[in-house]
Each structure stands twice: as C-alpha cells, then as structure tokens.
C-alpha cells in the first residue's frame, strides 16, 4: 500500500462528515467530534480501516476473485470508472440496474445483445442497414452502454464489492448481501456501517476524498493480481526444472 498519511487524508477532506442532524448513531464509534454542526471523522480510525481493507482486497484478488466498483453519484462516477479501468475491475458508475447481481442471467442476455451490436459496427454490417434501423439500434446501443460499459466482460458474479457511499448504493449492497458477496464500503456519518462487511469511515462527497479511496482500493487489486502473476511464474519455473 502506498504510504497514505494523516496529512494526505486531511488535505483530501476525508475528515468532514455530514451535518450532525443527519448522522446515523451507528457511526458514533468513528466520529472524533463536531465543528460548526458538522461531524468530524476520526482519521486515526479511517487510516486503520483503510490499511486493513487494503489487505482484505489484496488477499481476495490474489486468489483470482473479481471485484466490482460501485459509485453512481456525481462525485463518484469518474473516480470509480478511472480506477476500475486502471486495475481491471468491473464497475457501475451510472444507475444501478435492479437485479444486476440477483438476476444475473437476465443481465448476461443484455451483455450479449450489447456485444452483438458492437460486432455489427466493427464488421460493417451496421452500415448495410436502413437509416431508420441504424437509428433504432444506435439508440439501443447508447442505452445499453450507459448501463453495461463496466460490466460487458463480467461472465460470472464478482467475489467482492467496493462501494463509495453505502447510504446511496443501498440496492447494490442488498443484492450483494443476499448473495453473500463481501462488501468494502466508504461510509460517511449518515451511513449504517452494519450493512457492509468492511466499512471505511470517511467523506464520500468530496471529489478528492473519493479519488483517494478509489485509488487505494485499485492499488490493492493490482497488488493482488501481481501476486497471482508471481505464483504463475514460479509454477512455470518449477515445471521447467522438472523437465530438465
């Protein structure tokens, strides 16, 4: 894990929670105090949980399990997409479609249709259609892309979920819980940390804070995958020695 410091957390505004009247009492153990009717998050606890959950994500992905990044509110969309793409994770940065996980077979049909349209465009078949048909299919493609851009290569359910703002992404979290998929989530002072397996207390509204969290988790995924790579290299070397 990159050397994330208290200073880095402070500069990103990770310590700023919500207005005190909007708090969830279950977040009390992560709150340091209040200032101007705003709850202040205990950054020592944030740092502790961030380091712990980095190891959780690294260890999960080192076994070959896939992870899905979820963050659909405005501040989270770009960091979620950028960091998921960087580490090769699935992601949902637009609206979460109900049944994405719990009705996975239906989702796979939508993915198949999306890929069919993409193939039509790549092979030139699309240009052979009438203007009216092209317009209809293009509208369908745009709609599917908005929902499936980060899921088009997902052939099976992910083994882990990372969420920015557990309060906002309740539907995704409930689906993951139903399927017993572990959840790592950034929880602000208005969230219920009991709904997720691995809460990270922190500001889930400030763009810099969200970017920091997404970057750390993506780094953990990449480290986990590098462990797989090293294990495979060792197997190849062992096989070569046996052949000799």
From Swiss-Prot:
Q: Name one GO biological process term.
A: translation
GO terms assigned for molecular function: structural constituent of ribosome
Q: Which GO terms describe its cellular component?
A: cytosolic small ribosomal subunit
Known InterPro entries for this protein? Ribosomal_uS2, Ribosomal_uS2_bac/mit/plastid, Ribosomal_uS2_CS, Ribosomal_uS2_flav_dom_sf
Supply the alphabetized keyword list.
Answer: Ribonucleoprotein, Ribosomal protein
HAMAP family cross-referenced by the UniProt entry: Ribosomal_uS2_B
Which family does the record claim for this protein? Belongs to the universal ribosomal protein uS2 family.
UniProt-recorded name of the protein: Small ribosomal subunit protein uS2
Look up and give the organism this protein is from.
Endomicrobium trichonymphae
Q: Gene that codes for this?
A: rpsB
């Amino acid at each position: 894990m990159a050397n994330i410091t208290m200073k880095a957390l402070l500069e990103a505004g990770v310590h700023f929670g919500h207005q005190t009247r909007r708090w969830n009492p279950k977040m009390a153990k992560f709150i340091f105090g209040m200032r101007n009717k705003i709850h202040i998050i205990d950054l020592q606890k944030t740092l502790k949980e961030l380091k712990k959950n980095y190891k959780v994500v690294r260890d999960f992905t080192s076994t070959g399990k896939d992870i899905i990044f979820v963050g659909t509110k405005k501040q989270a969309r770009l960091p979620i997409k950028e960091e998921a793409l960087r580490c090769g994770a699935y992601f949902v940065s637009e609206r979460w479609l109900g049944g994405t996980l719990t009705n996975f077979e239906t989702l796979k049909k939508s993915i198949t249709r999306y890929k069919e349209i993409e193939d039509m465009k790549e092979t030139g078949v699309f240009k052979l259609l009438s203007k009216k048909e092209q317009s209809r299919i293009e509208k369908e493609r745009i709609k599917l892309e908005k929902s499936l851009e980060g899921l088009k290569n997902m052939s099976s359910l992910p083994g882990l979920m990372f969420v920015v703002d557990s309060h906002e992404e309740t539907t995704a979290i409930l689906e993951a819980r139903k399927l017993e998929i572990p959840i790592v989530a950034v929880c602000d002072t208005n969230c219920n940390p009991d709904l997720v397996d691995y809460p990270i207390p922190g500001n889930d509204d400030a763009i810099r804070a969200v970017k920091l969290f997404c970057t750390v988790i993506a780094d953990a995924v990449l480290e986990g995958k590098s462990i797989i790579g090293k294990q495979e290299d060792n197997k190849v070397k062992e096989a070569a020695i046996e052949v000799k």
